[in-house]
A protein has these predicted regions:
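Trp/Phe/Arg-rich N-terminal binding region typifying the photolyase-homology
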Residues: 20-186, 191
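Short, intrinsically disordered, charge-balanced linker/junction segments flanking boundaries
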Residues: 190-199
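N-terminal polybasic/positive-inside topogenic patches
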Residues: 7-20
Length: 199
């Protein structure tokens, strides 16, 4: 009798839950462009395609003359701005836009994340030690998940047949160990992107 009552309560519960539509939480992503200013072969941008909305951001470094960092030279600055304009036009053709801001990531990005109620930050990881430390510092300042994916590399670190401790000292031994490895296939530019979030 107890088993029958239990089965009836389970049937009633399953009949009740079949009328409930699961609630899906909207995900707002922020893609922070750094050095990879293209839509094609961009794994970090491709990882945002499932988001409900996407905010694309680029941060211009702020000149710091007091520590002898005066910013970019005139030619490099012009090249960067032309590249950003081209990226913006490509994004606009997909219903997106590029927000270009100035300042350090650990100060600017948390404010942007709060203003637009971002749920997830995506950016590229770079192999430099200082760059890795800067990403770790930024991650410690955020209250949301941050994903940093490798971009514009011929190989992924997991493909190498040696550890960092066994890294070849010169190029020829390195070349012999990696020349048989498959190069990571390129990714096409997305046909569509999630829309920007409402301000």
């Amino acid at each position: 009798m107890a088993v029958l009552r239990h089965r009836q309560s389970v049937d009633a519960a399953s009949a009740y839950t079949s009328y409930i539509t699961p609630v899906r939480v909207a995900m707002r992503y922020l893609h922070w462009f750094q050095t990879d200013l293209r839509l094609d072969d961009n794994p970090t941008l491709s990882s945002t395609l499932s988001a409900d909305s996407l905010l694309c951001v680029y941060l211009l470094p702020k000149p710091r003359p007091w520590c002898n960092l005066v910013g970019l030279g005139a030619q490099r600055d012009r090249f960067l701005r032309e590249s950003l304009q081209e990226l913006r036009e490509q994004l606009q053709s997909l219903g997106q836009d590029l927000m270009v801001l100035e300042g350090s990531p650990e100060l600017v990005l948390p404010a942007v994340i709060e203003r637009f109620e971002i749920d997830h930050l995506v950016t590229e990881s770079t192999p430099g030690w200082h760059e890795s430390q800067a990403l770790n510092h930024l991650r410690s300042k955020l209250e949301i998940p941050m994903t940093a994916l490798p971009g514009n590399h011929l190989f992924q670190a997991a493909q190498f047949p040696f550890s960092l401790d066994e890294y070849p000292d010169t190029f020829s031994p390195f070349r012999r160990k990696v020349e048989a490895l498959a190069i990571t296939p390129t990714l096409p530019a997305p046909d569509a992107l999630p829309p920007p979030p409402a301000a």
